[in-house]
Amino acid sequence: VPVLEVNSELADAAFGSAPERAAVGLPTAAGARESWLRAVALGGVGHYAAARAELARARRATADPALLSLTHGTEGSLLRQLGWHTHAAVVDGRAAALVLPAAVGRTPAPAATPAEILHAEAVCDALTGLAADALGTLRPALAARLLNRCRKYLDIHLPDAGSAWRPRVRLHWVSAETALSAPGSGLISVPSADRSADPALAHAEAAVVLAENSPSLRHRVKSRLLLAAASAASGDLDRSRALATEVDRDCRDHELLPLRWACGMLRSGVEPTGDGAEVAAACARLLATRGGRLRSASEVLGRP
């Protein structure tokens, strides 16, 4: 993520080693990009209402299409975390509309300037966001097409996996989720030469490798959570339980409440005698006080 000329504490809380800082207080944003970073950090610890307010501030403070797109993509992520995929698709559509038309006519060459890099990351965020929304509305084939488009764009415009770790990690996340939602469909190819590998496991493991070499603790934790889910789906419950226990501890220590809720839900399935269900319920109650309304199956809880 290009974070030049922004407060380093905000950057570290959003995409670095100290996401828990957002739970105790963050510096005031000096501009639209810092407001976006504040929103990302606040969303990571489950302060949804505060994150949405910060996204609104960011949108009022900029006319840059790429940054505006990122604010909409972040709002889509917040909605998806709570189960509101249909609503998320609307704001992710706005994110895509802000950057995709310009991307169509762009010269097929690596992004070179900070502005070009930001635009390319916004394109990838919009495409992976829409793919995740498609999964949540039971359209895995659409998700796979969007992921393929993102992969091709990423390979051309952000070819350096080291500097473009975040869009690549996200691509592996949603690829793994798509493979999990449509097992045996062949919609998702494995990201390696071993074509016999389980695509969900392979993408989850690839995300872990990339995230472990990134500065973002939150991305490392989420990648291990996804690997725990993929391991459970493949029948390796021991590995899943071990990973989920590790993830729960990290979420607790670093105030990653949304991920701890998701981990609790997984743990309630792979270890029914444990405290996963209780932890998930407690997290859901706390998220609700922070503006995070989880969608029920019948949507009786209302709108997000």
Where are these regions (language model features)?
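C-terminal non-catalytic interaction modules
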Residues: V1-T28, D238, A242-P304
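Tandem amphipathic alpha-helical repeat scaffolds
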Residues: P2-L10, A30-H47, L67-H85, A122-R139, ...
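Amphipathic alpha-helical segments of tetratricopeptide repeats
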Residues: E20-A22, R52, A56-A61, G93-P114, ...
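Structural signature of alpha-solenoid helical repeat junctions
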Residues: A30, L67, A115-A122, L142, ...
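A generic tandem-repeat structural signature
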Residues: R52-R139
